[in-house]
A protein has these predicted regions:
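C-terminal active-site subregion of NodB/CE4 polysaccharide deacetylases
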Residues: 1-70, 76-77, 107, 111-115, ...
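Anion (oxyanion) recognition and catalysis
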Residues: 39, 86-88, 207, 274-275
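Short alpha-helix within the catalytic core of nucleotide-sugar-dependent glycosyltransferases
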Residues: 79-83
Length: 322
């Protein structure tokens, strides 16, 4: 095996009767089609094999490129995905943000996704403005307007996401979204956390199926752009490993950068290398992981809701140059 590709999945949605049909994700039936097609074209590898590959302890003569399944954000959907993968004998890596376990709170992107999916843009923006006013943040500096008849829906959602990710400070972004969560979604859905995220019991069952878990920070900030203090950096990058290992009695050797683009992880590679807490760290930059690639800047292919099995195979073969 001269290299391997890694997949990054998020939502795996029901094939029918989805209670939140506007959540974009891979449908369960399409996910099965992905698995069946990928098993024919690639050698599916485990996290242990990925670690061995990066550190020179694996036979690299295999003709088929390797393929690793990974999942970000600790979503409730991943419990379904883990059981499906087990049916096919596949061991995946599930990257868990620890705030959902220790604080009982969702991560920022998931608040945005579910709130927009259920309430629509304008109701979300009303709650957003209320949150800004509540925390005495100047509304005019961060205001967003949406005109349904003239504005592009997807472009407006992208604008909203960028405000939370890059324009508001991370502390303000976090408290504004938690205000929206508590005063909108959680008020209407008392079981909100179970709808959005994995429970401790489900994570234990995922491990029992033979899968691995990894760290996805504590509360999902963009590490490189959030201007974290050294104390906050430790809480986000290293505390989760300690907590997950202590809670679930398992080794946590892999880390996944939240958002995963270069502006989100720049500079973090050197820190991870210096402290030796993790053996691998994954981005969402699309490339084949070869022996020359840094184990702390590994590539992944983010799977989108529009990716059919045929498109996925075509894109991955192009990346692997096979």
């Amino acid at each position: 095996m001269n290299g391997y590709l890694a997949l990054c999945y998020h939502y795996i949605r029901p094939a029918a009767n989805d209670p939140f049909p506007r959540i974009l994700g891979t449908r369960e039936d399409i996910f099965r089609e992905h698995i069946q097609a990928l098993q024919k074209k690639f050698r599916i590898i485990s996290l242990a094999e990925a670690i061995n590959f990066s550190y020179g302890n694996m036979n690299r003569d295999e003709e088929k490129p390797g393929l690793l399944f990974t999942f970000d954000d600790g979503l409730s959907d991943h419990y379904r995905a883990a059981r499906i993968l087990a049916e096919y004998g596949i061991k995946a890596v599930f990257f868990i943000p620890t705030c959902l376990l220790t604080d009982g709170l969702p991560i920022n992107p998931i608040v945005i996704h579910y709130s927009l999916a259920h309430y629509g843009i304008n109701e979300f923006l009303r709650a957003y403005r209320s949150a800004l006013e509540n925390y005495k943040i100047n509304v005019n500096d961060f205001n967003v307007n949406y005109r349904p008849k003239t504005d592009n829906y997807q472009e407006k959602i992208y604008e909203i996401k960028r405000i939370f990710k890059y324009k508001l400070s991370y502390a303000d972004s976090r408290r504004v979204l938690l205000f929206i969560y508590k005063n909108l979604f959680a008020k209407d859905f008392p079981e909100a956390m179970e709808i959005m995220h994995l429970t401790s019991k489900q994570i234990k069952e995922i491990l029992d199926l033979g899968h691995n878990i990894g760290s996805h920070t504590h509360s999902h900030p963009s590490i490189a752009s959030a201007s974290l203090s050294s104390e906050d950096l430790r809480k986000e990058m290293f505390y989760p490993k300690e907590y997950l290992e202590r809670t679930f009695y398992t080794k946590v050797d892999a880390f996944s950068y939240p958002f995963g683009e270069k502006q989100d992880y720049a500079g973090s590679e050197q820190l991870l290398r210096a402290v030796s807490a993790y053996k691998l760290a994954f981005t969402v930059d699309r490339f084949l992981n070869t022996p020359e690639v840094s184990p702390f800047r590994l590539g992944r292919y983010s799977v989108y809701s529009t990716d059919t099995a045929e498109k996925l195979i075509s894109d991955l073969k192009a990346l692997a140059q096979v």
